[in-house]
Amino acid sequence: MASSVSLQFLTNTFISKPQGFCNGIVSAPRPRSNLLRDRQNGVRPIKVASIETQPFPLFQSPASEESSSSELETADPDFYKIGYVRSVRAYGVEFKEGPDGFGVYASKDIEPRRRARVIMEIPLELMITIRQKHPWMFFPDIVPIGHPIFDIINSTDPEIDWDIRLACLLLFSFDRDDHFWRLYGDFLPAADECSSLLLATEEDLAELQDPDLVSTIRQQQKRILDFWEKNWHSGVPLKIKRLAEDPERFIWAVSMAQTRCISMQTRVGALVQELNMMIPYADMLNHSFEPNCFLHWRPKDRMLEVMSNAGQDIKKGEEMTINYMPGQKNNMLMERYGFSTPVNPWDAIKFSGDSRIHLNSFLSVFNIYGLPEEYYHDSELSRGDTFVDGAVIAAARTLPTWSDIDLPPIPSAERKAVKELQDECRKMLAEYPTTAEQDQKLLDSMSEARTTFATAVKYRMHRKMFIGKIIKALDIYQERLLY
């Protein structure tokens, strides 16, 4: 009975639009840009057999209530079938696809409990994993003895090429008839659907309005392209050449590795390893700075558990999330995953002046408490005020402040400091060639823009929105200062 219930939950679990099953064979997603041509122009952009299963009534998706958002589509049944027959289990969650990609959502109310609750189980046998440090070890070991792909992996830089090693294993998995990722790969985003900046063109990178980030992405693109040219030359064996016949295919695989890799410590028997892992189904969990889920390794049966937080009330339809990179600014999230947010509580800007405001006064105005690394907002004291969000928390961390328990703040001096800090913020905004409003209009006017182009515009817009939020927060601060 328990297994029947878990299968019922799984019927809504897998979000995807297949790229096209054709007689049981699916062509791999094709990247959109020609890297060799772009390189000559000074630009550096960047089969899967279906399982035969007998009809089974529980595989039919149950009639569900209308989604709170009409933009969300339920998952393709094939997505959960290929996992269920391989011991993947999901409890009380469903996978859906929206305009911004895939996500995992609660299919029923999850009441708060004293202990964390398992919502997903994925066995080790379905993962692609590699040890973080040399010597490279795979769990499970899918590379036959003597296969040249191991020599290619062994030639990578141990310090910086972790993504290339995972990409090589991913491509090798696609080439094996009996490997799960040959099926699962059909549900991965194609190159024109992926927001990773590894796939960005020079035109896309120019929209970032961030020279440092542009330089970093160009270096990564060059590193990956050079590696492909070195190891996929005309003289390589066919078993290697067919893995990535063109650089676009290889860069797409590296982008998948970067955006879907999870690093964690595992134990198999007595062997404890720090692994880089590509975990199917768990890689559909989106990011949040206030996640309601976390990942846990269960060593007794070599399972990865996705667990909901203890004591947290989750309503039906609420998205299940994890925190990808705690404590990282938007530029790091953009470099690694290809997304940003205007409410990142860890974002920061550099102030060059000497003006400072009183820290404790600023925190008390917005009901922010805790140590700097653990700031939180007490919404109960805000009486419905929705102004405070992650950007205000970030402002409390990034604004120049002073604190002295023996000296109270002088309102006139605080207002002077507020004005000087606001002026510096306005100068930062004036240095950008566009405003946040213009960026939003540009996004609204693009009906079918490239994913990487839209991602770049959002990044610069979110930066300006963050600076604008700091200006507004300083306005509220000086208005609420006690005389």
Curated annotation (Swiss-Prot):
Belongs to the class V-like SAM-binding methyltransferase superfamily. It is found in: Plastid, Chloroplast thylakoid. GO terms for biological process: chloroplast organization; methylation; plastid transcription; response to cytokinin; response to light stimulus; thylakoid membrane organization. Disruption phenotype: Seedling lethal, even with Suc as a carbon source. Impaired thylakoid formation in the initial process of chloroplast development leading to albino seedlings unable to grow photoautotrophically. Reduced plastid-encoded RNA polymerase (PEP) activity. Essential for chloroplast development, especially for thylakoid formation. Involved in plastid gene expression, probably by maintaining plastid-encoded RNA polymerase (PEP) activity. The keyword S-adenosyl-L-methionine applies. PANTHER family: PROTEIN PLASTID TRANSCRIPTIONALLY ACTIVE 14 (PTHR13271:SF54), UNCHARACTERIZED PUTATIVE METHYLTRANSFERASE (PTHR13271). This is Protein PLASTID TRANSCRIPTIONALLY ACTIVE 14. Mostly expressed in leaves, flowers and seedlings, and, to a lower extent, in stems and roots. GO terms for cellular component: chloroplast nucleoid; chloroplast thylakoid; plastid-encoded plastid RNA polymerase complex. Component of the transcriptionally active chromosome (TAC) complexes. Interacts with PTAC12/HMR/PAP5 and PTAC7. Binds to SL1/MTERF3. S-adenosyl-L-methionine binds at residue 324.
